[in-house]
Amino acid sequence: ERHTDPVWFGNKVFYISERDYLANLWSYDPSTGQEKQETYLTDFDIKTIDAGPNGIILEQGGYLHLYNPNSGDLEQLEINVNGDFHWARDRWVDVSPNQLTNPQLSPTGQRAIFEFRGEILTFPKENGAGRNITNTSASAERAPVWSPDGDKIAYFSDRSGEYQMIITNQMGTEIIKTISIPDPSFFFRPEWSSDNEHIAFTDTDYNIWIVNTMSGDSKVADTDRFAHPDRTMNPVWSPDGKWIAYPKLMENQFKSIFVYEVASGKKIQITDAMADAISPIWDESGKYLYFLASTDYGLNTGWLDMSSYDHPITRSLYLAVLNEADSSPLLPRSDEEEIKAEETKEVEKSADDKSETIITEAGLMRRIIAIDIPARNYIGLASAPMNQIFFMESIPNEGVQLKKYDLTKRKPDDFLPRVNEVIISQDRKSLLYRSGRTWGITETTGAGKKVGDGALNSISSMKVKVDPMAEWQQIY
């Protein structure tokens, strides 16, 4: 048996003893040599004791108790500590570039929009200040997207308890529409169609949803066959806003490219399952669909493999000619003397005139063309002006390099080094990039850009007011 923590109180020594198998308070009178059990606790041991002017303080069962040796009373103490808790007060926090997520651009690239700490922020390309359009610590606003006509912004908010789609004016001062999604969960990567009528996005259960922004009606366009930590089933709208393109896992765990017609619900498989195809992007003309494909992906299909090394992957760049009436943009060229004909006036089509996307299903896979660049570790594509495509190459020790291929020049150019994220505006004239802690907006024309071009300097001066206690209510 143990006897510990002796303290003097009056003419007696008080101590903890576990002679009856549970640590209780005992006393010893030196003048008589008598020992006495003072407490008869049966649930928890006494851990520590100390003596004060009014009795013995002891810790037991997670509480402090005061024992009066004269009366034998044991009183549980209620202790309230009013701390400063400055970290729980409302405060202004700096916006860190590394914490800006879900980036998007306004239609013409005049402002960038982000999610930050459950708020939606916009920043100007050059002139002006950053803007918090939500100011809601008590709810989380996520995944903003700007409408192609420029006057609306959509995002997901859990202010009702479940995530809903909120559509506001671009200043965030007026909620135009609130759309409830059936079977609410967590939603990802919204994309607004060019005709302003629909928004496509995915959910936790790997469904592609399409929401009518006018009526609020929603439907599931397709569902991925298997769960995978890399969410590659991200819908991309055709230039006319009538189709979406997306990769989908097949039985062999390779991904194939599909397109879905919103009006009819028709699905067309663009690529077979003999290669792993990702990152579909429509050409601005609507005639071609670019994508990346790998024929050496097989050893990487088991993503839960606990081995230390993954097999290296290479991908090649392809395009599919969608309409059988269109010819390949990469047909052999031959310089010939041009015969001058009588001049006729033709009305030039502007890039804003979105021609209808026509897809001829018959023979489609035979109209897939390999673009003449070496197979490398390409990780994604991004839209570009007509007959051009951005592609990203991951290079060991150099990071991700952004490059651009031009179907007219038939060669790639280095565009921007060391990029982490790339977003293209609706008009395909502006590019938002992140390189480390630098965000910038630059033009999609030309080549040889460098990190720092078009830097969003207003981020460094932006502060957001947060209410930590309201945030905790939302989080927990």
Regions found by a protein language model. Give the residues of each.
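A flexible loop/linker signature enriched in serine peptidases of the S9 family
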Residues: E1-T4, I16-W26, Y40-K47, I57-D73, ...
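Predominantly a core beta-strand signature of beta-propeller blades
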Residues: G33-Q37, G72-Q76, A129-R131, T173-T178, ...
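A short helix->beta-strand "capping" segment at the edge of beta-propeller domains
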Residues: G83-L100, T357-P374
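Conserved blade-ending motifs and adjacent loop-strand segments that build the rim/top face
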Residues: R2-H3, K36-D50, I268-S279, Y378-I379, ...
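Long hydrophobic segments that form regular secondary structure
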Residues: D5-G10, I113, G363-D413
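Blade-terminus and WD-like Trp-Asp/Gly-His loop motifs, strongest in beta-propeller folds
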Residues: D5-K12, T48-N54, Q104-Q110, P144-K152, ...
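Intrinsically disordered, Ser/Thr/Pro/Gly-rich linkers and terminal tails that flank
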Residues: I369, P396-Y476
